[in-house]
């Protein structure tokens, strides 16, 4: 049955422990289906409400674009970056070198080019990265989950490593 009211979809971005702050920091991407009843009116009201709350908005072309943006360009991408940190940490452990010292080699490259972000090699837990993988039914994306579980088995205290970097994550 078709709804007689417009439905707006807006993915949430931010870290749970500072969600109120992050909701205002990030642009609120949203979408309303092109064939939604009273879509232009709903869109206008939504933008006005968000602006009143101090939240910037950006309308996307269709719901699939926004959902894929959330899963592919945000949470799965973060998963791959953390996987690489996990792999590089396992290599550092294997060769008995300090992970942070090893990564300091890339600090200036990141500073000048912005394309060598250092991630922290913790276990991927939480409510976003791993659960969002299940929405895609992709063997390739599921490698993130497999690598994460392998890391937890191979590295002592893998699930507690984040504590070392907690202050840098704020």
Predicted regions: what they are:
Residues 2-14, 19-114:
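Internal alpha-helical scaffold of NAD(P)-dependent oxidoreductase catalytic cores
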Residues 64-68, 78-79, 83-169:
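Interdomain hinge/lid region at the active-site interface
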């Amino acid at each position: 049955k078709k709804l007689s009211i417009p439905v707006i979809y807006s993915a949430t971005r931010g870290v749970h422990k500072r969600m109120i702050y992050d909701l205002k920091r990030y642009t609120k991407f949203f979408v309303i289906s092109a064939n939604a009843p009273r879509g232009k009116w709903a869109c206008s009201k939504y933008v006005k409400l968000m602006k009143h709350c101090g939240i910037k908005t950006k309308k996307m072309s269709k719901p699939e674009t926004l959902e894929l943006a959330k899963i592919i360009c945000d949470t799965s991408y973060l998963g791959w970056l953390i996987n690489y940190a996990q792999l590089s940490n396992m290599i550092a452990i294997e060769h008995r070198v300090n992970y942070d010292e090893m990564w300091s080699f890339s600090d200036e490259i990141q500073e000048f080019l912005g394309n060598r972000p250092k991630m922290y090699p913790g276990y991927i837990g939480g409510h976003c990265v791993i659960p969002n993988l299940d929405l895609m039914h992709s063997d390739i994306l599921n490698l993130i989950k497999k690598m994460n579980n392998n890391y937890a088995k191979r590295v002592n205290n893998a699930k507690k490593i984040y504590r070392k970097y907690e202050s840098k994550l704020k």
